[in-house]
Design a protein with these regions (language model features):
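A conserved regulatory-domain signal marking ACT and ACT-like small-molecule sensing domains
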Residues: 1-81
Length: 81
């Protein structure tokens, strides 16, 4: 099983969870685990998500594509681990 784990964080806004899970689904991949937290005082949203890549998909490439999407479309920071 090839999986990717990512931590995203940045200003909270509507649609983050939907965008993240939708992107993973569009790749043919499957969410294995997801946790999220909102620091209301600082308005910072955190999400840790792990997903199983579709068969034949390179997890390093998929992680890099995910990072680019999050940074460009959600204007958030990402750590891939």
């Amino acid at each position: 099983m090839s999986s990717v784990t990512a931590l995203i964080y940045g200003a909270d806004k509507p649609g983050i969870v939907a965008k993240v899970s939708g992107w993973i689904h569009e790749q043919g991949s499957n969410v294995l685990h997801a946790d999220q937290h909102l620091d209301r005082q600082e308005n910072v949203f955190f999400q840790r998500v792990e997903w199983e890549c579709a068969t034949g998909t390179n997890p390093v490439s998929e992680g890099a594509s995910f990072q680019k999407m999050v940074e460009l479309e959600l204007d958030m920071k990402v750590k891939i681990g």
